[in-house]
């Protein structure tokens, strides 16, 4: 039973460290520096979210950006 508790704790630590699970909140200038743009409430179709510009604005960038 202790092994299950340990495995569960390790799993939670791994999920917290996963960079894709949370969006970085920043300034619009940070978004532009990353090659993105701010969009209110959602990103247009075919465009992915890469962060947050503010509470209601997402930082969006083309999936084909290199």
From Swiss-Prot:
Disulfide bonds: 31-59, 38-53, 43-60
Tissue: Strong expression in the tongue and bone marrow. Low expression in the esophagus, trachea, lung, brain and ovary. Expressed in the ovarian stroma, but not in the ovarian follicles.
Propeptide segments, given as residue ranges: 20-25
Top-rank taxon, per record: Eukaryota
Pfam families reported in the protein's UniProt record: Defensin_beta (PF00711)
UniProt keyword list: Antibiotic, Antimicrobial, Defensin, Disulfide bond, Secreted, Signal
Record has Disulfide bond as a keyword: yes
GO CC entries: extracellular space
Gene Ontology BP term (one): cell chemotaxis
Main location: secreted
Cellular location(s): Secreted; Cytoplasmic granule
Annotated signal peptide: 1-19
Recorded GO MF terms: CCR6 chemokine receptor binding; chemoattractant activity
Record flagged with keyword Disulfide bond: yes
Membrane spanning stretches: none
Family affiliation: Belongs to the beta-defensin family.
Functional note: Has bactericidal activity.
Protein name: Gallinacin-5
Organism, as annotated: Gallus gallus
